[in-house]
């Protein structure tokens, strides 16, 4: 287990529940479902929120993470059949335990951003504005050189494009400015023969897809996302955090050794190290992700910022209508979730499975349904939909942990969710 530098907490068993079915001050009605207020006292701090009857074990599991898995601050949300049934948060938004994690605290979710970004692409496909089997160069002519002429959007979405590592010498300011990094990608040669294997495109995924969104729609990826997904659903989620929201973001607590562990193990010139720290070794899992300029830039695969409530609502609206909004039609969603690749990943080595932009089971969310799709984020974040169970789930946190067997915090929450669904 990774040490975050914060002591484990014990859970005070004084759990205060609202009374189901009564519109008292401690309950909240939502389209026929009563969400009961809950408070769970921790050794320091508390868990707060609202939970529908029958889903109380999710809140208990969430609180247990503070005692058993060194949670610092986090939030978890669950939609079931288009309606919220769990909305909880707790702990602290900083390492010093001076900022309680509040209802409106937002957090960096790293690669959990890939799900919303992929959904932007699928909206363009569904509208007839993008064909995933045409070369990327059809929309972005400068891209079609140095062995990339036949790379398709399908290859990019399924991590087969061979552009996992970005070549070129770039400063951080250039990367954050967008144009220099996408120009570098357009000029480079692939890392492997496109389509011959798959390997995780940790950051280039978002730059390539974001440039496609810009060239087709005229909006940056963050602008398109806000206009067509976040605003219609009232989501507090951004790629390119507005400056006035930076103060509401939880402080990321990096894991020990997170910055250079891959390079030290495999060598700085290894493909894996180049992907995970690139471009040009600029990125590590360290305090740089708390910088305002990094949060305010657009990195559509890496720096989504939002709350669990919004990500759960987002996935609920991908699979079904939520308050009159559905993000993708059934036919497009089915195509998006068709398995494209499965097997040993050329970048991160263990088995991965991808549809068109979405991570798929079994690696996505162990213990969840077989047709789940979504995306995890580095250090623990997880957001996904299960169309069979009719759920949108999200968990966000600030204390990064890397565990080769999977994050025990999200695993505990997912198990509690499905146990509740089984008895509903």
Report residues per predicted region.
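Active-site-proximal alpha-helical segments within enzyme catalytic domains
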Residues: 159, 205-212, 298, 302-323, ...
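Active-site Gly/Thr loop motif
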Residues: 250-308, 335-389, 424
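Short, gly/Ser/Thr-rich active-site loops of penicillin-recognizing serine hydrolases
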Residues: 299, 320, 332, 337-344, ...
């Amino acid at each position: 287990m990774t040490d975050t530098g914060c002591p484990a907490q014990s859970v005070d068993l004084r759990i205060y529940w609202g009374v189901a079915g009564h519109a008292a001050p401690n309950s909240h009605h939502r389209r026929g479902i009563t969400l009961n207020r809950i408070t769970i006292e921790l050794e320091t701090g508390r868990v707060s929120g609202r939970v529908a009857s029958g889903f109380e074990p999710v809140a208990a599991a969430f609180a247990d993470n503070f005692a058993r898995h060194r949670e610092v601050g986090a939030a978890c949300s669950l939609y079931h059949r288009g309606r919220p049934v769990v909305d909880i948060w707790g702990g602290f938004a900083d390492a010093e335990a001076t900022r309680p994690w509040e209802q409106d605290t937002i957090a960096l979710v790293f690669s959990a951003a890939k799900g919303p970004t992929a959904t932007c692409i699928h909206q363009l496909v569904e509208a007839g504005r993008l064909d995933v089997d045409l070369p990327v160069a059809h929309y972005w002519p400068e891209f079609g050189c140095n062995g990339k002429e036949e790379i398709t959007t399908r290859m990019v979405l399924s991590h087969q494009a061979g552009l996992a590592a970005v070549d070129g010498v770039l400063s951080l300011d250039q990367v954050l400015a967008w144009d220099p990094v996408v120009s570098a990608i357009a000029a480079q040669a692939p890392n492997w023969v496109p389509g011959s294997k798959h390997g995780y495109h940790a950051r280039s995924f978002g730059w390539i897809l974001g440039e496609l969104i810009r060239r087709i729609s005229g909006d940056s990826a963050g602008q398109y996302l806000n206009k067509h997904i976040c605003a219609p659903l009232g989501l507090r989620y951004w790629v390119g955090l507005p400056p006035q929201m930076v103060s509401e973001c939880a402080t990321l607590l990096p894991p020990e050794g997170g910055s250079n562990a891959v390079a030290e193990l495999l060598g700085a010139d290894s493909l894996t190290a180049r992907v995970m720290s690139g471009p040009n070794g600029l990125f590590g899992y360290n305090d740089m992700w708390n910088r305002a300029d990094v949060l305010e830039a657009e990195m559509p695969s890496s720096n989504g910022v939002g709350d669990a409530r919004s990500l759960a609502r987002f996935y609920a609206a991908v699979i079904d209508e939520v308050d009159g909004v559905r993000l993708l039609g059934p036919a497009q969603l089915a195509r998006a979730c068709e398995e494209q690749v499965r097997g040993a990943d050329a970048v991160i080595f263990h088995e991965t499975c991808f549809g068109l932009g979405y991570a798929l089971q079994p690696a996505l969310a162990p213990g969840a349904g077989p047709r789940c799709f979504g995306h995890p984020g580095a250090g623990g974040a997880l957001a996904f939909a299960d169309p069979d169970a009719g759920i949108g789930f999200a968990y966000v946190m600030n204390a990064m942990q890397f565990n080769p067997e999977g994050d025990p915090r999200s695993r505990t929450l997912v198990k509690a969710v499905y146990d509740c669904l089984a008895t509903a």
